[in-house]
């Protein structure tokens, strides 16, 4: 086989352990998964009601243009329908972007502590990858701007950042964009945008008019609680969407996925309720970290990334034995840290009791 050389040594994306596997491995009846930043409250009740009372014709291909969902999102955001591109999750759109713009001879710039699919897909396409170290969990935008040259094709900016949760203030973001040449695509990944409460954050939609080389990425997998339906979308100038759309696979969103995403979008009261509950849950973790003097990054997401002062793989394993799945910082680029999805109040309280016990067992504190 004449494989791409860059595939040598590459591994598939490794998600958090599934609940069923942990139950079998440790003989547990109940396992709480706080590893993949799903919405612990699930999807809107309107979606649940729809799924109970409606069916689709499974023999027919879905609408390849996602017209009903396209109209719903365009109306919700106040953009043109031609400014939208839909994917099988935002991961799909990341792959579309890299396939369209990256190849041997060009480079792509990103933070070193960010979403792994940026460099994973860039590596497959053979592009040079320039990882810029984060500063206190935040993108070093000045260093990223300094790394741009004539061969730079795509810059990835994750805000709020995964796995740190740090959001980029509006003034800093705009100052950075002003330094980026017009022929370089800036992908602003906003998978957690619905959770942002930072006072210096502003609506980013106007940015795509001021900076036509910016593409926003959003998803229904996080706040909307539709991770299993795999619906992500991009917002940008029609000229960018027109170039990316031919790279998109046909029928990449199922009929059911399109329907439930549109319904979920219509229930903004539910999103607000989830955001408020998330803020309350976040305080539980912040109080724990401050009580035990554990460093954490200020999060504008539904997860928190903090230092355990121990081997995070050990903490991960010990919590799993007790029925809690989190993500080890060893797998995310910062050993010693763990990333925990903010769950319900009861889930958070239960995990923190067990984490307290585990950290005492590891000698982190008495």
Swiss-Prot record:
Protein name from the UniProt record: Histidinol-phosphate aminotransferase
Annotated InterPro entries: Aminotrans_II_pyridoxalP_BS, Aminotransferase_I/II_large, HisP_aminotrans, HistidinolP_aminotransfase, PyrdxlP-dep_Trfase, PyrdxlP-dep_Trfase_major, PyrdxlP-dep_Trfase_small
Alphabetical keyword list: Amino-acid biosynthesis, Aminotransferase, Histidine biosynthesis, Pyridoxal phosphate, Transferase
Cofactor names: pyridoxal 5'-phosphate
Enzyme class: transferase
Any single Pfam family the record assigns to this protein: Aminotran_1_2
EC numbers on record: 2.6.1.9
Disulfide bonds: none
Lineage: Bacteria, Bacillati, Bacillota, Bacilli, Bacillales
